[in-house]
């Protein structure tokens, strides 16, 4: 993506050189352009985007009408998840929320699976790294790891990173959705994400709400889940971001703390 001077900035650039077709890393220079001031800029395949700002490069966002097959018969039969919709897995400690999410990530009918480990135990993430490279996707015949993105911010990592991890997963999902792919974002867990929001709010000395959570917590959560959805792109293709997250009940979260 060509560099800009700010939001909404448009100015003329001249392509100076382009590398031939082939295989390159995202950090390799693939082109050099010259701006209106005569300065050269190296262009790579790295794209930068603020994670809290939604990617809205689509023409239309219709109402979800198809089912996202999770591969778990009980969910698909009694409580189906819409493609481009949101769903959650509630339960107390030890109920198997993370195990169920791992089962869905292995069998779900999606092109890209994004797993966000937000405040979870590190050993649960290590299991994914051990299992997924060995398992084969029955739809494509490739390894499951080839379609899986893992964002690891476990409980021993900084609070700021834990807060940003969920936004990062959604932004990556929107990036692949703009390519016309079917994306499933799985966050584990949003309860610990809310705890991170509370800690950051307290450190910034913001006005506290109920149980010391941010006053605008409901708006933050609703704006985040509003970024999911089925979209029609400008080229006529359709893409989707479906969100599934685990949730621990409030009083159990406080007891755990």
Predicted regions, residues:
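Single conserved hydrophobic/aromatic residue that forms the stacking wall/gate
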Residues: 2-7, 11, 247-250, 254-257
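P-loop NTPase nucleotide-binding/switch module
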Residues: 9, 28, 32-85, 101-103, ...
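Short beta-strand segments of a lipoyl-like beta-sandwich/carrier module
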Residues: 9-25
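Flexible beta-alpha connector loops of hexameric P-loop NTPases
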Residues: 64-65, 114-118, 148-164, 203-219
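The Walker A (P-loop) glycine that initiates the GxxxxGKT/S ATP-binding motif of P-loop NTPases
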Residues: 91
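Conserved P-loop
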Residues: 105-145
């Amino acid at each position: 993506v060509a560099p800009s001077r700010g939001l909404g900035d448009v100015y003329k650039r001249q392509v100076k050189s382009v590398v031939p077709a082939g295989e390159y890393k995202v950090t390799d220079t693939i082109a050099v352009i010259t701006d209106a001031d005569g300065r050269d800029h190296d262009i790579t395949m790295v794209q930068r985007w603020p994670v809290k700002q939604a990617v809205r490069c689509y023409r239309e966002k219709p109402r979800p009408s198809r089912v996202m097959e999770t591969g778990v018969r009980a969910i698909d039969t009694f409580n189906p998840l819409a493609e481009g919709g949101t769903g959650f897995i509630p339960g107390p400690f030890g109920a198997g929320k993370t195990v169920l999410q791992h089962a869905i990530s292995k069998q779900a009918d999606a092109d890209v699976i994004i797993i966000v480990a937000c405040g979870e135990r590190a050993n649960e993430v290590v299991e994914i790294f051990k299992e997924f490279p060995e398992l084969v996707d029955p739809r494509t015949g490739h390894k499951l790891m080839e379609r899986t993105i893992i964002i690891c911010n476990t409980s021993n990592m900084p609070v700021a990173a834990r807060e940003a991890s969920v936004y990062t997963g959604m932004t990556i999902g929107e990036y692949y959705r703009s390519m016309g792919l079917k994306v499933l974002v799985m966050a584990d867990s949003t309860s610990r994400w809310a705890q991170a929001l509370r800690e950051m709010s307290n450190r910034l000395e913001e006005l506290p709400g109920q149980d010391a959570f941010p006053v605008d917590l409901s708006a933050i959560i609703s704006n985040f889940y509003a970024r999911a959805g089925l979209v029609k792109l400008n080229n006529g293709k359709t893409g989707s971001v479906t969100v599934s997250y685990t949730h621990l009940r409030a009083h159990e979260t406080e007891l755990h703390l």
